[in-house]
């Protein structure tokens, strides 16, 4: 290298040497530093699918409560919304911003667990529309489901059977997985187009097991279909199952049951869960789902305190 080239390269050489020096000093600190998680709350924590009550139906009211309680963000339960017009979505987005809240999750419902191709097509279209709503709200991820077989009388009946329901007569789980995987493969381009990640939840149907969730995610093989991990949906031996899904998680939904659960209660060890998530490399949001009978005005702040204790 001649003198002119050496002089020209000198700033880059100096910068590189400084970066190496900085790395040698800062890298050990980065390894040991605990990640401080951002914690949001699902509007479900306030409303609980209470169709007969308007007390917590308003998304704006839930946003205001979340901000007052000290949350960092809010996950919206989509079926709780009474107006999904573009103007209504813009108002929700504006209100969250003025309150200093991230809109960080969108909990949606669909089912692909049906032999009827027209019903699956309808649910693909519905989910595409939900992806568009998330895009309009500025939400980066939506919770999605495999759906259920539909052989339970209702959700209460499903819960009495601990989330297990008979398959449709004449069909197998393998039939169901084919329908679900094919449907999500069709949805991946729609999610990518909008920059919204679908997170498949461990949420009954073929998603009742960690293996079932990963069978779908692995088959679709897309960064636009990952996992929404719910701490309260593995009713037996949850920790190994949570650990199995943690590396693929884009949103962690954290259940609490103050006042006793609406359907059941789990004694979850959040110190252990926090360790699982940290060791998996998860650095995303927590979304509180308070599913207890206690008044949310007292139960939700207690839940936030619990999560801050273990995830800060």
Regions found by a protein language model. Give the residues of each.
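A short helix->loop->beta-strand "cap" motif at the edges of active sites that frequently abuts
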Residues: 101, 196, 280-284
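Charged, glycine/proline-rich intrinsically disordered loops and linkers
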Residues: 154-172
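Active-site groove signature of glycoside hydrolases
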Residues: 136-155, 161, 194-203
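N-terminal pre-domain/capping segments
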Residues: 2-141, 166, 171-178, 182-185, ...
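Acidic/histidine-rich catalytic cores of soluble enzymes
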Residues: 73-74, 103-106, 173-275
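A structural motif
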Residues: 71, 139, 249, 282-283
